[in-house]
From Swiss-Prot:
Pfam families: Ribosomal_S8e. Belongs to the eukaryotic ribosomal protein eS8 family. Keywords: Ribonucleoprotein, Ribosomal protein. GO terms for cellular component: ribonucleoprotein complex; ribosome. GO terms for biological process: translation. One of its GO terms (molecular function) is structural constituent of ribosome. The gene is rps8e. This is Small ribosomal subunit protein eS8. InterPro entries: Ribosomal_eS8, Ribosomal_eS8_CS, Ribosomal_protein_eS8_arc, Ribosomal_Se8/biogenesis_NSA2. It comes from Methanocorpusculum labreanum (strain ATCC 43576 / DSM 4855 / Z). CDD domains: Ribosomal_S8e.
Length: 125
């Protein structure tokens, strides 16, 4: 777990004296790191009793073609580009904004696989 609260140290190196300890709502989670493979999702309970679905592995993407206005479920071949991190291309990690190669051609991911549990993409020319 990652604690995302305020630092205990000042910029000068001095110490802040906290009026309270760490709280559960200040804890973050490790990233989903969605890769290409047989679809595997994980459901997580979040604040307010709601749920988030994390895509840990994904085999297919819902690709939308702007010209025809149709959406097709297509197999993902590989990750071509990822502006979030160049190392993600080597590891085939998929995030929002990543460009993937599919059976229809190149497509850009518009959903957040680590939050939505699915990969929605738009075909690019």
């Amino acid at each position: 777990m990652l604690w995302q609260g305020k630092s205990v140290r000042k910029a000068t190196g001095g110490r802040y004296h906290a009026s309270r300890g760490k709280k559960r709502f200040e804890i973050g989670r490790s990233p989903a790191d969605t890769i290409i493979g047989t679809t595997r999702v994980k459901t997580i309970r979040v604040t307010g009793g709601n749920t988030k679905v994390r895509a840990l592995r994904c085999e297919f993407a819902n690709v939308s073609d702007k010209k025809t206005g149709k959406v097709q479920k297509v197999k993902i071949n590989s990750v071509a580009e990822n502006a979030a991190n160049p190392n993600y291309v080597r590891r085939n990690l998929m995030t929002k904004g990543a460009i993937i190669t599919t059976e229809l051609g190149k497509a850009q991911i518009v959903s957040r696989p680590g939050q939505d549990g699915v990969i929605n993409a738009v075909l690019i020319e």
